[in-house]
Design a protein with these regions (language model features):
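Conserved phosphate-donor/acceptor-positioning beta-strand/loop module used by diverse small-molecule
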Residues: 55-61, 71-96, 126-127
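Switch/connector loops and helix/strand junctions flanking conserved nucleotide-binding motifs
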Residues: 1-3, 64-67, 86-92, 132-136
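Conserved AAA+ ATPase "sensor/coupling" helix adjacent to the nucleotide-binding pocket
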Residues: 24-28, 92-99, 139-143
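ATP-dependent small-molecule kinase phosphotransfer cores
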Residues: 1-55, 61-65
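Alpha-helical elements of Rossmann-like donor-binding domains used by nucleotide-donor carbohydrate transfer enzymes
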Residues: 44, 66, 110, 136-140
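Conserved catalytic network of the ASCE P-loop NTPase/AAA+ motor domain
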Residues: 3, 47-50, 69-74, 116-118
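Ras-like small GTPase catalytic G-domain
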Residues: 74, 86-89, 94-116, 131-132
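NTP-dependent small-molecule kinase module
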Residues: 98, 113-165
C-alpha cells in the first residue's frame, strides 16, 4: 500500500532475498499472502523479547500456528479480531485498498477460511467500535499478565491449599 514505509510498517526485500531468508531459517513465521511475502524476523523478535519488550503480531491463523508450534519460552497471548459483519468487513477492505473490488473480494474469500479458526485463539473480540475493541484487548492482556505473575500464582496456590485443608 502506498502509505506503508520501509523500516516502519515493514522491511521490504525482493522475492529472491525473502526466499533466501526462508532457506536460512530467519523467520519465526512467514506466509505468502495474495502474491506478497510476509514474515517476522527471528533476530528482530528475539532482540525485543530479550529487552523485555512485548510484541504484537498482526498475522493470520497460519502465522499464529507457526509461532505457537515453536515452543518458545515466552507467554503468547492470541486474540482473534472479528468484524461486526461481513458487509462491514467488505467496506473496510474497499476503503483500505483504494476501492479495489478485486482485492476486497479475494480477501473476503480468504476470510471464509480464516474465520473458521477463531476457536484456536485465547480470546476473541468483535471490532464493532475501535475504542471498545481496544479496551477489551487491553483487558485480555492485563488478565493474562496477572495469570502469569508468580505472586498471583503463589496467592492462588496458597488459597487453594487453605480450601482443601
Amino acid at each position: 500500500r502506498s502509505n506503508e514505509t520501509d523500516g516502519n510498517d515493514y522491511y521490504f526485500v525482493s522475492v529472491s532475498e525473502f526466499k533466501n531468508l526462508i532457506n536460512q531459517d530467519k523467520f519465526l513465521e512467514y506466509a505468502k499472502v495474495f502474491q506478497n511475502y510476509y514474515g517476522s524476523s527471528k533476530d528482530v523478535v528475539f532482540k525485543k523479547l530479550n529487552n523485555a519488550e512485548n510484541i504484537i503480531f498482526d498475522i493470520d491463523w497460519q502465522g499464529t500456528q507457526q509461532i505457537k508450534s515453536q515452543k518458545l519460552n515466552y507467554k503468547i497471548i492470541t486474540i482473534f479480531i472479528l468484524p461486526p459483519s461481513r458487509n462491514e468487513l467488505y467496506n473496510r477492505l474497499l476503503n483500505r485498498d483504494r476501492n479495489d473490488e478485486k482485492i476486497a473480494k479475494e480477501r473476503m474469500i480468504q476470510f471464509n477460511e480464516d474465520v473458521l479458526h477463531w476457536r484456536d485463539y485465547d480470546f476473541v473480540v468483535i471490532n464493532d467500535d475501535l475504542e471498545n475493541c481496544y479496551k477489551k484487548i487491553i483487558k485480555f492482556i492485563k488478565f493474562s499478565q496477572e495469570k502469569m505473575d508468580p505472586n498471583y500464582q503463589r496467592l492462588i496456590s496458597s488459597h487453594v491449599e487453605s480450601l482443601i485443608n
